[in-house]
Amino acid sequence: MENKFFEEEKGLSACETVIMKAIWDEEEDISIPDLIEVLRTKWGKDYARTTVTTFLTKLAAKGYVKTYRKGKLSYAHAVKSEEDYKTKLAANDRDFWFGGKLTNLISALCRDRKLTKSEADEIRKILDDSVNN
């Protein structure tokens, strides 16, 4: 099966993913010093400033972020949304690992634990809405 995600999307390394998650979790653009602090305190990543700026340069080349200076500080701004990334990532997993079958993906996700009634009801609503649209 052809996998368009790998052709159209430039995937993220594990380090790039953590950096993007830290950026996406912020409500506004984040300064590089603040990003370094969030990476250290929230994600346990003790990256040097040069390491973070190198990753940001790579992320900018892939179209995920833009960086800019404001006064003496540099800032990172997410260009691609977390929702778009997660949607493409899930579709990639569905196509690559589960033969394009959503039922196989859902089955795998439910295999390690039972759904609560609330979760099952919410999934039913999502499925009903997607069939009717």
Residue ranges and their predicted role:
Residues 88-132:
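Amphipathic alpha-helical dimerization/coiled-coil segments
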Residues 70-89:
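Short, cationic-aromatic polyanion-contact patches
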Residues 37-47:
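Short helix-coil junctions and helix-kink-helix linkers
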Residues 29-39:
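Short acidic, hydrophobic short linear motifs in intrinsically disordered regions
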Residues 66-67, 117:
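Short beta-strand "wing" residues that participate in macromolecule-binding interfaces
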Residues 63:
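Glycine-centered, phosphate/nucleic-acid-interacting loop/turn motifs that mediate DNA/RNA or nucleotide
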